[in-house]
UniProtKB/Swiss-Prot annotation:
It comes from the Bacteria. Keywords: Ribonucleoprotein, Ribosomal protein. Disulfide bonds: none annotated. This is Small ribosomal subunit protein uS2. HAMAP family: Ribosomal_uS2_B (MF_00291_B). The lineage of its organism: Bacteria, Bacillati, Bacillota, Bacilli, Lactobacillales. Pfam families: Ribosomal_S2. PANTHER family: 30S RIBOSOMAL PROTEIN S2 PROKARYOTIC AND ORGANELLAR, SMALL RIBOSOMAL SUBUNIT PROTEIN US2M. GO terms for biological process: translation.
Amino acid sequence: MAVISMKQLLEAGVHFGHQTRRWNPKMAKYIFTERNGIHVIDLQQTVKMVDTAYEFVREAAANDAVILFVGTKKQAAEAVAEEATRAGQYYINHRWLGGTLTNWNTIKKRIARLKEIKQMEADGTFEVLPKKEVALLNKQRARLEKFLGGIEDMPRIPDVIYIVDPHKEQIAVKEAKKLGIPVVAMVDTNADPDEIDVIIPANDDAIRAVKLITSKMADAIIEGNQGEDASADFQEAAAADSIEEIVEVVEGDNN
């Protein structure tokens, strides 16, 4: 049974790629057709590749992997934070700070500073400090939380990274490659799939599409952590939708 159905993908708009002039030719094999200047992703491949990604992530989680979700564009930020948290994992959803992986020791020092400021507030230190100093500390904490809050409790460099829009998150991809960390990603028609270890051809610009795929990756982690029986709630029957239905939906959406 497939993890995701063609119907779910269609309803979330996962099939809509970028304008044809903005494509990466390396994505040609994942493109079904072109409609009104827009590339349409081959969802039959996406169904299978979501299965592959799900199994990869599930297996990693079953082996106690640390998994980092990355998506800093506004369409991805909320889903990335929510689903990573639901799965008990970690996320970066504002801006990727250069060196997050390759200069982890420096990042750890910044995280330690964030925890130190939080502790100062908790133990009453703020109450005896001048208001001006407290204001500066709060400003520093807010900035650190914005960029590092999602990895504050990450115990080590991640074992797997899941990325929404690797075209935008190229620095994250490069750092992962340098350290040999496998990358699972939603790859739209404008991205380079050669950089990605586990590809999910998908529209990475629609909020519903991002939420759907990202939630499946979170489900995979939960299943990996709890065993197959616990995953029954997450598995939905995949209808045997035909390629003809894609044509009908695509033509309907573009008329």
